[in-house]
Regions:
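Conserved catalytic or regulatory cores that recognize and/or transform ribose-phosphate-containing ligands
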Residues: 1-111
Length: 111
């Protein structure tokens, strides 16, 4: 299973859209994908869930433990994203391979 890591804070709608595009693409190729952005974005926006970083990071890191590899989508600012960096650190600690993907072609025109 692939854990999809994407920076989120400050560009929530873009991150959600890019996560959906990449998850759909990967799933069409037969991959099983876990996207905490897709799950968390919908839950937080529709069901009055907490929006604080620590709440979601705790859940995200638990989900990461179940995955075989992690894909990081290199949206602008990914290197400074506290969440992405913590996920990279945890994946490294767990021995989970990390693949970095360029965001070119994933960002909708006008953003």
């Amino acid at each position: 299973m692939i854990y999809l890591s994407v920076p989120y804070s400050g560009m929530e709608e873009l991150s959600f859209e890019v996560s959906c595009l990449m998850a759909a693409f990967l799933m069409k190729t037969g991959a099983t994908v876990l996207s905490p952005i897709i799950q968390g974005h919908v839950l937080a926006s529709k069901y009055d869930m907490p929006c604080d970083h620590e709440f979601w990071l705790k859940h995200d890191l638990e989900m990461l433990k179940k995955c075989d590899e992690m894909y990081v989508i290199a949206l602008p600012g990914w290197e400074k994203s506290v969440g992405v960096q913590r996920e990279i650190e945890e994946a490294g600690r767990l021995g989970i391979p990390i693949v970095f993907l360029e965001a070119a072609g994933l960002i909708p025109k006008g953003d």
